[in-house]
Design a protein with these regions (language model features):
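Hydrophobic anchor at the start of a short beta-strand
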Residues: 55, 173, 304
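A short linear-motif detector with a strong N-terminal bias
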Residues: 72-76, 108-109, 126-129, 151-154, ...
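Alpha-helix C-terminal capping segments
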Residues: 87, 165-166, 296
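Short strand-edge motifs at loop-to-beta-strand transitions and within beta-strands
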Residues: 323-325
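Extracellular glycoside hydrolase catalytic/binding regions
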Residues: 92, 99-236
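Active-site mouth of glycoside hydrolases
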Residues: 1-158
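Aromatic- and carboxylate-lined catalytic core of secreted/periplasmic carbohydrate-active enzymes
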Residues: 181-184, 196-318, 328-342
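Generic secretory/membrane-interface signal
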Residues: 80, 94, 145, 170-171, ...
């Protein structure tokens, strides 16, 4: 959630309140905060907490016509000290130092590093911290960055890159903006619900996290800009995935390919618990095999389920399975296989 208002296509209205005293016509007093705005913001964060939702508070962003993105360094620091001090007591707050920091080229790396120190100094509770990109990535190895908040920078490769990013940065990966379900003219906002769901599954099985968004233009309000009702087809499927992930045992991680397991596992991601061979979750994405063969770990027996991630259906296969097995599959996209040791 942004503290400063956003000016962009489909989102051009003035907000009811501003963080600083003043208005667009008469100008803003960058030495005086508007208490009505901040009280309303606190109420909204509290409401999110009541719904079990984390608030990733975006402190700075470039989509601006009021002058907030062009404040000088001293004013930025003054604002950040106040914002973080006022909001850090909420347990559901995260700090996004910027949305698309690279679209603010007048702010230097030295500026961002200073702002990060201000945030840490003013937040005794150590909430999560990130800095989000448009095209150019910030140095995500910086120690103040707790997790990588990353926008996909390739038209086609999105959640598939989670494996590479996890290995590169050794931090949790949050794919913020893997694209949006919708039908607008921009390439980032017109993928199908099926593709959005696939990206969520792909990213989660690879050990990452993803954010959802929706931009359908035929409705009075565009959810991405204004909130309101969701009209897309993927939210229920994402909720289904959330239930699947909640059932994943502690200690699971993406399967690491080795010369021994490469041939059987190179083509689909797998989330598993290799320490005791107790759990395997394979996701096939847009592949649609008629069958799949596995050589199960010696001495282990499994219950096996076919999961239709789009129809949100789980089919338990009859019997107990061990050794070399062949699993019949429906030649359908977006399937998964789950194996649980008994």
């Amino acid at each position: 959630m942004c503290i400063f208002p956003k000016f962009y296509t489909y989102n051009t209205a003035d907000p009811e309140y501003y963080a600083f005293e003043g208005n667009e016509k008469d100008g803003f007093d960058f030495t005086r905060f508007n208490p009505v705005f901040w009280e309303n913001l606190e109420r909204r964060i509290r409401q999110l907490d009541e719904l079990g939702i984390e608030a990733d508070v975006i402190l700075l962003h470039p989509y601006d016509r009021w002058g907030f993105s062009k404040m000088d360094r001293d004013t930025d620091v003054f604002y950040l000290k106040y914002a973080v001090s006022r909001l850090c007591h909420f347990k559901n707050v995260w700090w996004a130092l910027a949305n698309e920091f690279d679209l603010l080229p007048w702010k230097s790396v030295e500026d961002w590093e200073l702002y990060a120190r201000v945030v840490m100094c003013r937040d005794p509770y150590g909430h999560l911290r990130s800095i989000h990109n448009c095209v150019e990535l910030y140095d995500q190895t910086r120690p103040w960055i707790t997790h990588v908040s990353i926008q996909r920078i390739d038209v086609y490769k999105t959640a598939e890159a989670v494996s590479e990013w996890r290995e590169l940065y050794q931090k949790p990966i949050v794919v913020d903006e893997c694209a949006y379900e919708g039908n607008i003219n921009f390439g980032w906002g017109n993928i199908t619900g099926e593709e959005m769901t696939r990206r969520f599954w792909e990213g989660c099985i690879r050990g990452g996290y993803l954010s959802h968004g929706e931009v359908y233009v035929q409705h009075e309000q565009i959810w991405w800009a204004h909130g309101g009702r969701l009209h897309g087809t993927c939210p229920d499927r994402i909720a289904f995935l959330k239930d699947i992930m909640a059932d994943v045992p502690e200690g699971c991680a993406p399967l690491k390919l080795t010369p021994e397991n490469h041939e059987a596992n190179w083509d689909v991601p797998c989330l598993c618990k290799e320490s005791d061979h107790s759990y395997y979750l394979y996701y096939f994405g847009f592949f649609r095999p008629a069958f799949r063969t596995y050589e199960l770990p010696k001495g282990c027996a499994y219950e096996i389920e076919l999961i239709d991630t789009w129809d949100m259906a789980i089919q338990k296969l009859p019997g107990i399975h061990s050794g070399n097995i062949k699993i019949g599959m429906p030649e359908k996209q977006y399937m998964a296989i789950r194996m649980k040791k008994i």
